[in-house]
């Protein structure tokens, strides 16, 4: 298939592009490089074993989107492009709604003009809000996300659901993922956050490699086994595989298809720190800090629907997530070259 991957040079997008190329698909990457670097592109090609086409541009440029969809005879779109820092979204709500909601509107309007009807959306477990029951199941009603980031994901899900009702021949997958971590096992591709990392694993990795002094663990008084927050961590390679499987199985299958992509188990912040200490062979310096507003004590996925319907399940452990992250970070202490 000929696949347009928006945000394809970012963390999850780049790993997914490698898996798509390895599966023989033709990949066109669209990215404005606001959160990624051009130097990842040759790595994608080398690991994928095939050349991807790259277009530098913005999903909010509807004319450019229409041109790409037409000129490359795109069959399906996997949509990763968007801003993703929860804390930043509270400070910059308009930028998040413009990029994530308006950007997606421009993209699907271009798809309609180009008669492309297969769409995979990179959604998030944040759309569930605060649920009374764990694990989270796709049949749960969506909640009220705490941040503009989460709200933007939920708004896009609602827009896509309305679109599919009005245009019943569209196939739309809403992939709700939990906490992606890890890196390509080669050690040559991984998460390379710009500035201070917003997520746990890259922050731990930067402490271990000497770029940061200490990890702040927000809250050690939660009603969990060790008092720290519990989340569902999924290896980015398992997540990438989930996108490829969803794309291949759901192409031209009309409907809105909703799947949780998670490991189906919860691990605490201290579990992750301990796994990383084991991977890098030394203790990771950390300290406790007050809880962050809006953080939930614990949640994880019920991913049995994806197992049942897509024959997809995670195969990589927390130890492998830590080992692969350390392999990447220790080989590339400063991330990708500028």
From Swiss-Prot:
The keyword rRNA processing does not apply. Changing residue 124 to A: No major structural changes. Catalytic efficiency is very low and affinity binding is 21% of the wild-type enzyme. GO terms for cellular component: cytoplasm; cytosol. It catalyses: UDP-alpha-D-glucose = UDP-alpha-D-galactose. Its EC number is 5.1.3.2. SUPFAM superfamilies: NAD(P)-binding Rossmann-fold domains. Its cofactor is NAD(+). The active site is at residue 149. Inhibited by UDP-phenol and NaBH3CN. NAD(+) binds at residues 11-12, 31-36, 58-59, 80-84, 99, 124, 149, 153, 178. Substrate binds at residues 124, 149, 179, 199-200, 216-218, 231, 292-295, 299. One of its GO terms (molecular function) is racemase and epimerase activity, acting on carbohydrates and derivatives. Keywords: Carbohydrate metabolism, Galactose metabolism, Isomerase, NAD. GO terms for biological process: carbohydrate metabolic process; colanic acid biosynthetic process; galactose catabolic process via UDP-galactose, Leloir pathway; galactose metabolic process; monosaccharide metabolic process. NCBIfam families: galE, PRK10675.1. Belongs to the NAD(P)-dependent epimerase/dehydratase family. Involved in the metabolism of galactose. Catalyzes the conversion of UDP-galactose (UDP-Gal) to UDP-glucose (UDP-Glc) through a mechanism involving the transient reduction of NAD. It is only active on UDP-galactose and UDP-glucose. This is UDP-glucose 4-epimerase. It comes from Escherichia coli (strain K12). The lineage of its organism: Bacteria, Pseudomonadati, Pseudomonadota, Gammaproteobacteria, Enterobacterales.
């Amino acid at each position: 298939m000929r696949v347009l991957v928006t945000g394809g040079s970012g963390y999850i997008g780049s790993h997914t592009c490698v898996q798509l190329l390895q599966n023989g698909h033709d990949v066109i990457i669209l990215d404005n490089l606001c959160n990624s670097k051009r130097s990842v592109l040759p790595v994608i090609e080398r690991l994928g074993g095939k050349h991807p086409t790259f277009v530098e541009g913005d999903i909010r440029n509807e004319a450019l989107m229409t041109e790409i969809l037409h000129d490359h005879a795109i069959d399906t779109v996997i949509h990763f492009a968007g801003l993703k820092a929860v804390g930043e979204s509270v400070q910059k709500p308009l930028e998040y709604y413009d990029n994530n909601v308006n950007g997606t509107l421009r993209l699907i309007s271009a798809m309609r003009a180009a008669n492309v009807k297969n769409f995979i959306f990179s959604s998030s477990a944040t759309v569930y809000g605060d649920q009374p029951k764990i694990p989270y199941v796709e049949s749960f009603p969506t909640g009220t996300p705490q941040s503009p980031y989460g709200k933007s994901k939920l708004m896009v899900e609602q827009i896509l659901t309305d679109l599919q009702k009005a245009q019943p021949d569209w196939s739309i997958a809403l992939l709700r993922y939990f906490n992606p971590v890890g890196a390509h096992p080669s050690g040559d591709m991984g998460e390379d956050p710009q500035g201070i990392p917003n997520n746990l694993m890259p922050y731990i990795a930067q402490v271990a490699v000497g770029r940061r002094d200490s990890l702040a663990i927000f809250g050690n008084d939660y009603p969990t086994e060790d008092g720290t927050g519990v989340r569902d961590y999924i290896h980015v390679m398992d997540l990438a595989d989930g996108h490829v499987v969803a794309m291949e199985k759901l192409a031209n299958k009309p409907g809105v298809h909703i799947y949780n992509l998670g490991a189906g188990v919860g691990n605490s912040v201290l579990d992750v720190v301990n796994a990383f200490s084991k991977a890098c062979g030394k203790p990771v310096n950390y300290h406790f800090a007050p809880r962050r507003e809006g953080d939930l004590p614990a949640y994880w996925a019920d991913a049995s629907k994806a197992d049942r319907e897509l024959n997809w399940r995670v195969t990589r452990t927390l130890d492998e997530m830590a080992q692969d992250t350390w392999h990447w970070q220790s080989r590339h202490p400063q991330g990708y070259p500028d």
